[in-house]
Amino acid sequence: TRDAHGVVTDPDVDLVVEAIGGIEPARELILEALQHGKPVVTANKELLANVGAELYAAADAAGRDLLFEAAVAGGIPIMRALRESLHGEPITRVLGIINGTTNFILTKMTDAVAGGGEADYAATLTEAQRLGYAERDPTADVEGFDAGAKAAIIATVAFGAKVVAGDVYHEGISRITASEIAIAHRLGYVVKLLGIVERDAESGDISVRVHPAMVPIHHPLASVRDSFNAVFVEGDFVDSLMFYGRGAGGAPTASAVFGDVVDAAINLRNG
């Protein structure tokens, strides 16, 4: 069928999976599905990072699930952990490597320096594109836009903050030089592009940002290589937790979507 509105309002359709991407008409269709009592599963980070608050409110009003595990860090179940397992945890900070393209590039540059070679950003980006880790136009990844959208979603889920992608400070990796990688290496650090969401202990304000950072070589995030992602959660009771795995790709994303479909179906069956 070409009638998407007919699908999301069809009484014989129990659950809707949105996979069309973008903001419109995805937003309109999800709202319509929720209003007709249907749970929705999506992997649309652009949508959630810009109009997520509206969609979460609509899901609450309808009493239906809006699940989006695949929108952040692919196959890593960080959304479920924040929403369920850590629901009672006073979280203080979430930080992580949430873009596989930039982590692949930085890993290769670091390896080149460690091996006594030259860490060339342009050549490494070309290699990432050849291997399929980077898009032909890599701007969204290498300038931090993609990680910024994911950080906005994390802020909303972890802290209940109404953060949109445009609010997130972002700085990418395109200006990182071989000498900076080498200096970090000599000092016992590695350079990683981090998404950081944290609550100020005194004011309660939430800050959300994406930028390259020098990570101590002994920190768990320093060992995250190539296109893998990792999210580090810090809380008052649990201290520190790290979630690690493939953050992108068809199979991890499909696994996350299918997991949400199963959860939504179980919840729908149980009323």
Predicted regions and their residues:
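A structured beta-alpha segment of the ubiquitous adenosine-cofactor-binding alpha/beta core
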Residues: 1-15, 19-25
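Conserved active-site and cofactor/substrate-binding residues in soluble primary-metabolism enzymes
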Residues: 2, 11, 50, 73, ...
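Generic hydrophobic/aromatic pocket-lining and core-packing "Φ" positions
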Residues: 4, 27-34, 56, 125, ...
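Rossmann-fold NAD(P)-binding glycine/threonine-rich loop
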Residues: 20-36, 43-84
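Rossmann-like NAD(P)H-binding beta-loop-alpha module
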Residues: 60-134, 138-146, 153
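Substrate-binding/catalytic subdomain of NAD(P)-dependent oxidoreductase enzymes
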Residues: 108, 122-230
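ATP-dependent carboxylate/acyl-activation modules
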Residues: 218-271
